[in-house]
């Protein structure tokens, strides 16, 4: 016999063993399919310990293999914005035109026959948004007439910031005064009262300065030398009087000078409304800048 010869009885035994192991693996595979079958709820319920994921998988009809999550691909981080320098920030800020100021410009553009003030045309924000289209001598290329629409919200903003030069620079005075020329009602009364208050602040400041100047002149006269025997005694009296005046001056509340541009804006608006019955206030030592 050759070494590779297998007896018949051994071949029969091996064949039976192979068939048996094949049946077992087949049964095991079927068992796994049954376990993975999402409709086989009885199998899961028999355990009594279902997790939330398993319950969700059963409801959605998913198998275990389909619930495996793929690896998340991390998104590249967004680049940090580069910080602008102070000059760059100011340059960017100067090119921004507020909606309320655009509202004023459109009002002047449609309601006035006059040219825009040179100061308006030279603003960076106006150049950036309008270019050369605000020059009255140049006809519109498109031939389209701009229609201005009234906005109560924007008007309230203009009234609120009438005395704020940061929000409404003095270069907008002509546009602002034209807009408020026909203002009526309670808003007009409140604005008149505030403008008069600004003029009164100026007069109070001027009076305070005049009082202090007179006091300084009196001090200078008191400190002048006196002839003869009364010189020494006069110096003592003068120094005493000077000390008293200084104490009184220190005790007086310092009157701050109001912003002259706001005083001028208030004065011009009151002059527009001077035909009303409201009492006019005369400014002391005030010269209007042209």
From Swiss-Prot:
Instruction: Locate the compositionally biased regions of type Polar residues.
Output: 40-50
Q: Can you tell me where the transmembrane regions are?
A: none
Q: Which residues form the signal peptide?
A: none
Region feature Disordered, mapped onto this chain:
17-91, 220-259
Bias (Basic residues) ranges: 66-83
Assigned GO CC terms: nucleolus; nucleus
Q: Name one Pfam family in it.
A: WKF
GO BP annotations of the record are:
maturation of LSU-rRNA; ribosomal large subunit biogenesis
The UniProt regions of compositional bias labelled Basic and acidic residues, in chain numbering, are 233-249
This entry's Gene Ontology molecular function terms read: RNA binding
What does the further note read? Answer: Present with 1850 molecules/cell in log phase SD medium.
Q: What is this protein called?
A: Uncharacterized protein YCR016W
Q: Which organism is it from?
A: Saccharomyces cerevisiae (strain ATCC 204508 / S288c)
């Amino acid at each position: 016999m050759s070494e590779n010869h297998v007896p018949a009885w051994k071949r029969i035994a091996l064949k039976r063993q192979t068939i048996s192991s094949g049946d077992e693996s087949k049964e095991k595979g079927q068992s796994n399919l049954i376990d993975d079958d999402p409709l086989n709820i009885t199998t899961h319920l028999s355990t009594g310990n279902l997790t939330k994921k398993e319950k969700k998988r059963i409801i959605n009809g998913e198998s275990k293999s389909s619930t495996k999550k793929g690896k998340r691909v991390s998104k590249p981080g967004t680049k940090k914005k580069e910080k602008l320098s102070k000059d760059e920030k100011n340059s960017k800020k100067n090119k921004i035109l507020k909606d309320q100021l655009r509202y004023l410009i459109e009002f002047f553009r449609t309601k006035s026959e006059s040219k825009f003030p040179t100061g308006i045309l030279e603003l960076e924000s106006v150049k950036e948004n309008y270019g050369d289209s605000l020059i009255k001598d140049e006809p519109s290329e498109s031939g389209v007439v701009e229609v201005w629409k009234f906005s109560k919200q924007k008007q309230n903003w203009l009234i609120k910031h009438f005395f704020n030069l940061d929000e409404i620079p003095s270069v907008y005075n002509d546009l602002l005064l034209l807009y408020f020329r026909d203002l009526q009602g309670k808003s007009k009364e409140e604005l008149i009262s505030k403008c008069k208050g600004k003029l009164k602040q100026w007069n109070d400041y001027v009076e305070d300065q005049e009082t202090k100047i007179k006091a300084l002149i009196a001090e200078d006269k008191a400190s002048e030398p006196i002839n003869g025997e009364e010189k020494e005694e006069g110096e003592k009296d003068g120094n005493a009087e000077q000390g008293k005046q200084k104490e009184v001056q220190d005790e007086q509340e310092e009157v701050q000078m109001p912003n002259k541009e706001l005083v001028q804006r208030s004065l011009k608006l009151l002059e527009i409304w001077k035909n009303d019955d409201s009492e006019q206030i005369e400014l002391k030592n005030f010269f209007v800048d042209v």
